[in-house]
């Protein structure tokens, strides 16, 4: 019996403009997966579209069709074996020809394809594989023109995109360029076999006390015969835990394992993200013919929605433990998707863990990510909120579209269902908001799917019928949510139910970020504030020295957000003393972003302790797809902005918070208040009660001296997984204590300072922050690590260290107050390298 064999078709390709029939038109392709922009750049036919205005120079590529071709030798084919040509992804309108005969036509980027080419490869010798990629931009416009009755409305990009199953951000978004890729964007190979394990999956039943788990393992067998047997082995850290053998019934072999005292999969910060390995080996006639394995986790995951005093809850519970989901939204990490390596994916997820984030939302305008992305999330304990790929639009529902969408959903849920990191599937991004804003028909009480198809919002059929049925069938233990935002069919801005995208800071009514916590809902799955990336990133795409000023054309070109000039200007001028030199301007935008994220996260985490009022906060956005100015808190080159560190501190396992009442200075003729209230609290995600000491000092901004007696609370009992209020009715008498002062809080547990927070008078522009007496001393040095000791004579706001590639700082964007030295560890900086530069407000 012949065993399974596969032959990669990654090399030997060439490509050309489909309309150029000259002999010299063909150009080499280094390897696939790739997309045409990568191959054009490699052949010096295109310059890096991420630099300067070169995106415009690349626009001609968007309206072209392309042909890829390779010649390969027929592999050895044992008697009785089949040869399968397998494509894991074709972008997007692809006609595949083998020896001149069409064997596949595809129009969905998110689907894999398997074609039996046994007969087509009958002859030995060379075989020609050719793929014509039709222009997706033009095909989309043709499809739109064929259905003028449909309401083609949405946000971002050409509305025609909604007729094509291709990554929607390729049409351009408010943070990314218009780069219409085409190509073999995922692996292609030949498989030769008589039989194989086509799929392997598990279903887990974990006992309430976690002392035992039953794992049911299933293997779908293709080509099974009467002698077929599947050997299942469950292992942990390379050690066998259990094994069993089963014969396929109706092409599926099934076994059940009883695991005593299982090691559970936990999000980072709550326990180890333990992974078991399940393998399935197919034996026929006493010989092994194929084997596959997958990593799985034993855990329960649920979304708790129950009536309460705030409305209806929305939070995640893992293994019986309520988890406040502090995290980020994820967009594709590059416009040229095949250029993202597994190592780069892992660095992104490692950065999240470094920032104490526990959830990432894969946004619905990108793609179902590469396996290595989810593997990193599994291994590092980052939960995944997985959108289906629909974003910001009113999607058509032609019969062929619905058929393609269902296949897409089935393929991707089956591909991803073994990942313990995936805890929720969500139907779309903001499509229900499009429905609301455009006045499309949506009657939540109408439960007849055929009526939905007849309405002017027909995609409800996708989100409330096709997708939930696919998830229920193929991943029944995973929660499904119709859209983001969405809550029981109510208006998407309802703060009492479901999840919410809160954009009234930056977009919408442009509220002050100081009140962000009052604007949230039950789960804040989008919110954000723009900031410039670091100067090193700007220098990558700004070529000319004369363009290095804040309002230059090239900088505006690299900020795709509508109205970004006035929004950035508004938040800067309201809060800070503005500047016109680029380096200072960059820093000031970063201060605003860091403060915005802090005010939001800090308040919403506090609300977690109030009957789970807020179940989580996923900022928009973690990352960028090109070097740009956006809402990202880490730029394209994985360089964290100050907001990254501000969020990490608020998500500390135990965090102290202090906040005074901030009066709106811009609507009261800037009249200072006579009195202000303040509050002091501790937020904890620990699962046991903790005792600590809390101190609150009142320090003059001008002198650094204490202006009133400090408050100390010893032996504070900190409640587990919640909020402990220390002071709820504090009062500052501004007539008695007239000089501006900070409220500096510290928390000790077991004699060690574990958390700090500093509340500042608002706005910063009214404060004189010169002459801070800041001292940064190097107190220890090794080959690649330095420890800095930082002190100040007067309060310092937002001390930010330079970001260098390969160098990691343990903290940044810090507030330093007199009498409280802080340490920062710098890893990866060689002893002979120049010290990191730093900047603080008022410097």
Curated annotation (Swiss-Prot):
Report if keyword Glycoprotein is assigned. yes
InterPro entries for this protein: Beta-gal/glucu_dom_sf, Beta-mannosidase-like_N2, Beta-mannosidase_GH2, Galactose-bd-like_sf, Glyco_hydro_2_Ig-like, Glycoside_hydrolase_SF, Ig-like_fold, Mannosidase_ig
Q: What class of enzyme is it?
A: hydrolase
For this UniProt entry, the molecular function terms from Gene Ontology, in alphabetical order, are: beta-mannosidase activity
Which Gene Ontology BP annotations are present?
A: glycoprotein catabolic process; polysaccharide catabolic process
Look up the domain of life of the source: Eukaryota
Q: Glycosylation annotated at which residues?
A: 721
Q: What keywords are assigned to this protein? A: Carbohydrate metabolism, Glycoprotein, Glycosidase, Hydrolase, Polysaccharide degradation
- Give the family per the record: Belongs to the glycosyl hydrolase 2 family. Beta-mannosidase B subfamily.
Main function: Exoglycosidase that cleaves the single beta-linked mannose residue from the non-reducing end of beta-mannosidic oligosaccharides of various complexity and length. Prefers mannobiose over mannotriose and has no activity against polymeric mannan. Is also severely restricted by galactosyl substitutions at the +1 subsite.
Extra facts: In contrast to clade A beta-mannosidases, which are likely secreted, clade B proteins appear to be intracellular.
The name of this protein is: Beta-mannosidase B
Name its species.
Answer: Aspergillus terreus (strain NIH 2624 / FGSC A1156)
